[in-house]
Amino acid sequence: MARFSSKNLTKLFQYLVLSLLSPVAFGNFNIEVDTRNKVLNDAAINFYGQNIGIITDGERRVFGITDGPLKEACSKVQGGKPGYVWVRSPTPANLYEIHNWRQVLRVLTAYDARIVGIEQKPEMVATQTYKNRSDHPAKVSGMITQSVSNTIENKWIEMNQFSITATVSCKVKAAEIGLSMGYERSWGKEDTNSTTTMLGQQTGFEVELPPGGNCTAVLSATKGSMKIDVGYRATLEGDCAVDFPNTWNGHHYWCYPIGLVQDVGNLKKHIDCRELITIGYYSDAHVTIENLGKKKNKKTKKPPRKTKMN
C-alpha cells in the first residue's frame, strides 16, 4: 500500500477540493478609446488584460483534447500509445505535485481592437416657432434645447464555452464632441448603457421679425455610430501527464508539453472570440432659422363677374 507524508496528504486534499470547485482564474480586461479630434477614426485604442485558469472539461472539448484525441496525439510524440492521459489534478499518485509538472492552463488574452465602422448623418432634433404679434419690427431671441441619449452596447460573436470569471471594462472619451462614457460587465454579458445629454445649451439665437412675422428655430445635430471590434484569443500552457501500460524507457509516467502534443497531433492551437462594441452619440448641435418673414394673409376669392344678358 502506498504511503504518503502528512505534507503530501495535505496537498493532495487541496487538489481534490480544487477539482470540485470552480477552476482557479484571475485577470480582467480593459478597453480604452480616446479620440484625438473630431475625426473619430483617428482614435487611440488601448486594450490589455489576460485571464488564466486551470482548463475545464468544457474547454477541453472546445480545444479537441478530450481523452481519445489526446491519447492519439501523445502516441506520436515517442511512438507508444498511453493507457491514460491527464491535463490537471487529481491524478493517481498526485503526478503533477510529486514531479512538479504544470497543470494545463487556459490563457485568454485580449489581442486585437480596432474601429470597424463609423456612420454619421444629420438629424433634426427639435423645432420651435416664434411670432411677432406687434405692429412694428421686433427682435426675438431664444434658446432651443433637447435632451438626447448617448448609448454604448456590446455583443459577443463566436462565444465559446470558456469558464471565465472576469470583468470587461470599456471607456470611451471624445473630448471634442463632449462624449465620455463606458461600462463594466461580467465576461460574456451583453447589455446597453445610456447617458442623457442636453443639446442646444450653447446655441442661442437672435433674429429681427417684421410686424406680424414669424420664424421657426430648428435644432439639428449629427447623429453618429462608432463600432469597435475587440478580439480575444485562448491558448493552452502546461503539461500533459501520460501513463503507459508497460514501462516506456523505464518509466510508466511521462509528461509532454501541451504545445508539443498539439503540434504533433495537429490539434487546435488557439480559439478566438470577439466582442463588438457600438457607441451611439450626438455631436455638432446647431440652430438654423427657417420661414423668416411676415405672415401671409389668405387670399379671398373674388365673386364671379356677372354678365348682362340681352
Swiss-Prot record:
It comes from the Eukaryota. Residues 1-27 form the signal peptide. Keywords: Disulfide bond, Membrane, Secreted, Signal, Target cell membrane, Target membrane, Toxin. GO terms for cellular component: extracellular region; membrane; other organism cell membrane. The keyword Secreted applies. Contains 3 disulfide bonds. Expressed by the venom apparatus. SUPFAM superfamilies: Aerolisin/ETX pore-forming domain (SSF56973). It is found in: Secreted; Target cell membrane. GO terms for molecular function: toxin activity. The keyword Secreted applies. Gene3D superfamilies: Proaerolysin, chain A, domain 3. May function as a large pore-forming protein. Belongs to the megalysin family. This is U-megalopygitoxin(8)-Mo15. It comes from Megalopyge opercularis.
